[in-house]
């Protein structure tokens, strides 16, 4: 009988293939005294140049495969390799102690790694991994060591590793890489996000999978359930070969839903839309058959720049998107702060940055920055269907202030004779419990709501979703959260306003029947999830989903809801 191991289901898909175990190179970096300081600095500079060349090449590969948003990760990596403060410290150490370049770089980068990895802010935790990735690349070049090039894999394998860096994941070719398993990581890590974009099955957080598996072992994985199977017998192999074939056939069957409307079995119409963060991602929306864009994350225009983008730069980007999409495109205004930083603007240190000066709180305070964005969005509305929504709204006064500011920008454009859609919809994110509880009052002023479940879960359960010690509190099917969603939807519908959802929950097959039953109007998800969601929706009767929703609202625990949903899905025709 096979041995089963459970990890974090990070990217769906079923695979059966031989393992390729990639162990992290253990660099034996010894402190050595050197006589030629200048030569050592030259070695460092040459290694940095080679590393930047590597990263630019990987960035171009990523740009072609996955678009601008994912490729932007390597801008950050190049910034680290080029960081003058880090280089200055390394050079100073070489000069002062007359030590070898690799030892000096390892010492300095390790100090930064330790400092950042101990911080609570997920942004800095992520940066610590980036620093480690880049510094090891530079050190490898100093030592003349071969760097693993995963793009050269030319046979079907499942990669086993402690972790996969963004630069490694970007090189994977799904023709040969049938999946990957790692000791660490979770659904929101770079590796998981890349895997979903590449449509490569992945299970993370397996703790010691590199010790349990050897290269060439035959293994199976189910990226939907998070199950890995080892020590397969003949029956197990046949079973998984059948599962793989069924999965391939299912993906082929889903293609017929591309040009179909999103309907329940009893012909109730809903919308299934896509989330994107870059103008380069528009093609994936068109290919997916999504009925619009429920979330365009505008902050990537800011994060990929070395300055606040001008009104004209933003206008061109927004216009490019709405002119290609025939359905509504909802733009979230600048959601910066918390885990999202800008290289050219320093936020003050805060005890709780996720609860601090961010999103709408920042833009209402910095109306000079906000004005460029609102004017650009209004101007773009003349070229397609466009909605504007404000993030992190906590009070009605905040929403009124933001909406009034839009009206002031309209008056300016009128005076200048610049065209825009005067009926552009103005909505808000519901990601703070106060907004959900008072949704019926907010609905008097907002044209629509979009529920951001990632933050709503985090704020409802007072738990950092990036902190593994409290990850058990990430409970999207907890009845308390479902009641907040129900309050939001009923409050909006009371005033004939529509409600969408743009968090990960919108694309979750377990959540979909409940959200249908709660009468959610629009489901916005990653483009790769659209057809699967539309297919599932077509099998569900709205009347039965409403009965399910009423039952789960009376539950006490996440587990009880899970059981009801599993029974419901298992009984679909």
From Swiss-Prot:
Taken from the record, one Pfam family name reads PEP-utilizers
- Could you say which enzyme class this protein belongs to? transferase
Could you list this entry's UniProt keywords, alphabetically sorted: Cytoplasm, Kinase, Magnesium, Metal-binding, Phosphotransferase system, Sugar transport, Transferase, Transport
Query: Which amino acid positions bind phosphoenolpyruvate, per UniProt?
Result: 297, 332, 454-455, 465
Under Gene Ontology molecular function, one entry of this record is: phosphoenolpyruvate-protein phosphotransferase activity
The entry marks the following residues as binding Mg(2+), namely: 431, 455
What InterPro entries does its record include? PEP-util_enz_mobile_dom, PEP-utilizing_PTS_enzyme, PEP_util_AS, PEP_util_C, PEP_util_CS, Phosphohistidine_dom_sf, PTS_EI, PTS_EI-like
* Record-level GO BP terms: phosphoenolpyruvate-dependent sugar phosphotransferase system
Documented EC number(s) = 2.7.3.9
The keyword Transport appears for this protein: yes
- Write out the catalytic residues in the record: 190 (tele-phosphohistidine intermediate), 502 (proton donor)
The protein's superkingdom reads Bacteria
**Know anything about its domains from the record?**
The N-terminal domain contains the HPr binding site, the central domain the pyrophosphate/phosphate carrier histidine, and the C-terminal domain the pyruvate binding site.
- Family statement drawn from the similarity comment of this UniProt entry: Belongs to the PEP-utilizing enzyme family.
Q: What does this protein do?
A: General (non sugar-specific) component of the phosphoenolpyruvate-dependent sugar phosphotransferase system (sugar PTS). This major carbohydrate active-transport system catalyzes the phosphorylation of incoming sugar substrates concomitantly with their translocation across the cell membrane. Enzyme I transfers the phosphoryl group from phosphoenolpyruvate (PEP) to the phosphoryl carrier protein (HPr).
Know the name of this protein? Answer: Phosphoenolpyruvate-protein phosphotransferase
Organism of provenance = Mycoplasma capricolum subsp. capricolum (strain California kid / ATCC 27343 / NCTC 10154)
